[in-house]
Amino acid sequence: MKVSVYVTLKNGVLDPQGKAIHHALEGLGFRGVNDVRVGKLIELDVDEAVAQAEIEEMCRKLLANMVIENFRIERQGQTTGHPAGQPA
Amino acid sequence: MNSAVVVFPGSNCDRDMAEAIRIASGKAPQMVWHRESELPSGLDFIAIPGGFSYGDYLRCGAMAAQSPVMRSVKSAAERGVPVLGVCNGFQILTEAGLLPGALMRNAGINFICRDVALKVENSQSIFTSRYDNGAEIVIPVAHHDGNYQADEATLDRLEGEGRVAFRYVEECNGSARNIAGILNEGGNVLGMMPHPERMVEEAHGRSDGRRLFEGLLDAVSTTNGHSRMAVS
């Protein structure tokens, strides 16, 4: 089963890469871009037996750094996650 | 002083670290490969060197923090063994949960490689006892991800408990409150982005970093019940 894990920076965490990309888009003449934030998409292929709680544990322990990042899990069309993940 | 330098695939400051320890203490450290699940017994000091462990995959230090050897480093740190993480070593210690906060991409995007002035904010720690409180020292930085961030409550706590060991005198990489190095709650774990091991002999231009290792040697010698003279 395919599971997509989206890892994004928490609100308020400065994203220098996003800022640089934003500047580059403006340099290319694109108007109307208000902000750019860079995140990661991690695709997992897991057995059906792997519980949601276990995937969340994978995110907390390794895939995301809960100090600065949130994660969102998309599993067979469902979306779950912790957009307001607790700071460590 | 019985010491060890942990080596990960992609570490590149491990030998500089070993040489700095040898120069300051007179005894070369043991080099410990990351796959080892046990550290050598009787260690007085563990260093986690700089570099690009695991090619900085996922996040700087994230993969190294999960290596077998880090479980032993964690338990040694919990027993009070001094642990120093420099640059990638600092990143690894935060990823391993031994130090709070995170090191993000430098605010100006660029890799920064130059000498920087640091203020010694706490000269009472086992790592900083050879510096005067408030002294300005010069130590080089070489990093892309040294932008220290933590939530305000954590930053306040670090400041209030004297756990900010070093601060950049001038803004360097966007770090919150210009923090360059922090201590854990027990004071036996220090993480810092600047490289003290690159400033240990006159040929380096200055030797400001050497006093960090010498201070540590003092602390270890006292703990082991030897006089400083007997060791040096």
Regions found by a protein language model. Name each.
Chain A
Residues 2-41, 47, 54-88:
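Long, contiguous binding/interaction regions
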